[in-house]
C-alpha cells in the first residue's frame, strides 16, 4: 500500500506513451484544489513522484484519458471556483514529474459526472457529462489536443432528460463511442447510445436499453481481447446489487450510425456479483 495524501474525487488513467499511471484528485489538505501525481509500477510494488497542482480552486468529478497520438494526457473536472464549469487541462509526463497547460472550459455552465475517453480512430477526446445549464441533459463534446492545449467543437445532447450518472468508453473494433447512462426520463432505466465522431462533431444513434429497470452508476469499459463492451451497474430494483452486462455491437453498427438511426446489438447476458450497495 502506498499513500500520497488525503484526497477526494479520485480518478486514474494509464499513460501508454510513458508507461505510467496518472492519478488526478481533489487534495483535501489544500482546500480541495486539483492535483495530479505520476505512479510507476515495478513488479508488485508502486512508487510515486511529487504531486503537482493543475487547479487552484475546489475541484470535483475528475476523469482522465490518454492521447496516444500526441502523448499527452487530458484531465477533465468540474471547477467549483469558476461557477462549476466543465474544464479540461492537458498534462505532460516527464519521468515521474507532471506539468500542465492552461485549463480550458468546455461547458460554461454547471457540469458534473464528467467522463472522458480517447477515440483512436479520429484521434479526438470525447467528454460526456451532465449539463446543469441545459436541464441536466446528457451531453457530449469532442476535443482536439494540440501541444499543451485543447480546443472543442459544439456540444451535442445524447439524452434529452436528466442524466444523473453516466460513463463513456470507445469500442476500437468498430470505431464507435459508447455512453452508458441512467435515464431519469425513462424510469432510470440503464441505457446506452452509440456515437460516431467526424471532425470535431459527434452524432448519436437511438438509445438502447441494457437493463429494463432502475439502474444507477453504470460504468462502461471495452474489452479489446473479446471485442465486447462490459457495463457494470447498481441494480436499484434488486437490492442495489452490483451487476454486469456484456454487449456486442453487431454488423449494422460497424457502418456509419447517423443521428436518430438505430444499430443492432447483442445483449449477451448479465452476471450478478451479489454485492449489496
Predicted regions located by residue number:
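Extracellular, repeat-based ectodomains that mediate carbohydrate processing or recognition
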Residues: 1-277
Amino acid at each position: 500500500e502506498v499513500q500520497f495524501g488525503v484526497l477526494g474525487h479520485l480518478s486514474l488513467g494509464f499513460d501508454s506513451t510513458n508507461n505510467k499511471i496518472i492519478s488526478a484528485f481533489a487534495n483535501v489538505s489544500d482546500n480541495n484544489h486539483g492535483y495530479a501525481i505520476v505512479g510507476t509500477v515495478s513488479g508488485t510494488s508502486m512508487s510515486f513522484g511529487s504531486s503537482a497542482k493543475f487547479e487552484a480552486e475546489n475541484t470535483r468529478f475528475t476523469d482522465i484519458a490518454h492521447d496516444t497520438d500526441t502523448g499527452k494526457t487530458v484531465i477533465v473536472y468540474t471547477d467549483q471556483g469558476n461557477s462549476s464549469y466543465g474544464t479540461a487541462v492537458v498534462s505532460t509526463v516527464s519521468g515521474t514529474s507532471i506539468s500542465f497547460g492552461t485549463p480550458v472550459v468546455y461547458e460554461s455552465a454547471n457540469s458534473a459526472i464528467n467522463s472522458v475517453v480517447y477515440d483512436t480512430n479520429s484521434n479526438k477526446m470525447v467528454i460526456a457529462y451532465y449539463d446543469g445549464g441545459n436541464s441536466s441533459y446528457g451531453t457530449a463534446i469532442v476535443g482536439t489536443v494540440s501541444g499543451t492545449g485543447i480546443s472543442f467543437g459544439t456540444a451535442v445532447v445524447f439524452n434529452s432528460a436528466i442524466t444523473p450518472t453516466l460513463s463513456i468508453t470507445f469500442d476500437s473494433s468498430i470505431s464507435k463511442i459508447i455512453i452508458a447512462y441512467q435515464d431519469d426520463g425513462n424510469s432510470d432505466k440503464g441505457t446506452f447510445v452509440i456515437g460516431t465522431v467526424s471532425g470535431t462533431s459527434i452524432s448519436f444513434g437511438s438509445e438502447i436499453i441494457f437493463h429494463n429497470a432502475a439502474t444507477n452508476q453504470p460504468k462502461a469499459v471495452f474489452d479489446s481481447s473479446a471485442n465486447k463492451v462490459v457495463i457494470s451497474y447498481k441494480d436499484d430494483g434488486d437490492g442495489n446489487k452490483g451487476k454486469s452486462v456484456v454487449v456486442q455491437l453487431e454488423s449494422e453498427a460497424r457502418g456509419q450510425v447517423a443521428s436518430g438511426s438505430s444499430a443492432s446489438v447483442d445483449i449477451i447476458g448479465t452476471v450478478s456479483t451479489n454485492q449489496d450497495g
